[in-house]
Amino acid sequence: MQLEKLLDGVEYTEKTVREVEISGICYDTRELMPGCLFAALPGYKTDGHKFISQALALGASAVLCEHAPEEAGPWIVVPDARAALAAVSANWFGRPADRLTALAVTGTNGKTTTTYLLKAMLEGVLGAK
């Protein structure tokens, strides 16, 4: 998938790469395959930015990060890497949440009964579980 398509709806402040084919998305260099977009996520014990050089050496096509690394490379700087990773992942999988319909049942009494009745009606109409 083209990087530009993956970045649809992602707010970024700096981008040093344009047309690149991305073959996957990864945030762990131990699982990175050549052609992947590497997301450098800040963490509690370690910071994914420490692994940018390793990711590029392993063949990452681009890096999604919160601050530009010192080394030159194909990166996209975003204000929140976790939010950007969520948006990029949604784009990668074709935004499946956009095709979902959610129902909610609220109230004090009768929620369980109502949900069982709704389930039975929807299964009868849609023919699926």
What is each stretch, according to the model?
Residues M1-A87:
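N-terminal leader/targeting and accessory segments in enzymes
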Residues L7-V10, L85-K129:
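Phosphate-binding loop of NTP-binding sites
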